[in-house]
């Protein structure tokens, strides 16, 4: 782990918004100085791809100016369906030698053109294979062009590029170091972290602080919004989003004469689509060798602001479920659920340095 005495910036990029966290990580935990976010208009950023570079430079420059942020070391957290991941078992050697093996033999692990991807690894620990100690790793391959675009974006806005991180890794680091969730939920063995975003959902399964599974799900809060639009066709996306967040409780039954009955029913239909995809991944995880049962589900992102969303997950999956609001070792006075990935990205590990 790399500790720093100065604040750094971490930006989390999604199709719906950019969120930023300014702070530092040390042995006592994470100290957050400031957090900020901005929604992104259509046609600017989609599925990890920068569609309108100049417009994104303008938006990010305005964000930095409004928050008095100048030239500072900056990490970026990204996710995309184009990012490939594979488990592999490698010889028990140093991290430098592991990376050399991966670089030399990458096409044996992942069916990609090595020249088109930047491939790094996460150390999942020691395993016994055919009587020998070996190292289990999770390989993460980011398209070279995607990595280069994001680093160019940081440079164009006057920032100093640091590490390019992956969403699943960022939230895993936060869970591993953050301590008790919401000050009352103790640290456990296995957590399913659900980033319920506006344009995508991400499920990361973190076992003993190590990322085991991470999947990008294209169904998202937008799925619920589309269902609600069928009953409220005159409302804009932003109005429907605000309506969903203002509902008293998405899970509790409403009076039959309530004007919100149709809205809640429609929203649940959209949420059920997301839950179906999440359930498929949970079932896949349960088939893995040395499977560790899930202790609880942790919900964050814009969709976590829907009242009763924790009850929806609890009833749907029959697992304790909580909305992430704070963590014992994260010093920040406000809810962290919109900034969890960015805060996790402040923690720098040698294997995710660019």
Predicted regions mapped to residue ranges:
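Gly/Thr-rich phosphate-binding beta-strand-loop-beta motif of the actin/hexokinase/Hsp70
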Residues: 1-38, 72-79, 181-223, 228
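N-terminal phosphate-binding loop and adjacent alpha-helix
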Residues: 35-66, 330-334
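Glycine-rich phosphate-binding loop plus the immediately following alpha-helix
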Residues: 45, 148-173, 210-256
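Phosphate/pyrophosphate-binding loops at sites that engage ATP/ADP/AMP, CoA/4′-phosphopantetheine
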Residues: 60-73, 157, 235-239, 279-296
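Active-site neighborhood for divalent-cation/phosphate handling
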Residues: 77-179
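Glycine-rich phosphate-binding/hydrolytic loop that grips phosphoryl groups
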Residues: 170-173, 178, 304, 322-354
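Adenine-nucleotide phosphate-binding core of ATP-dependent small-molecule kinases
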Residues: 231-234, 242-294
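Glycine-rich phosphate-binding loops at beta-strand->alpha-helix junctions
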Residues: 292-316
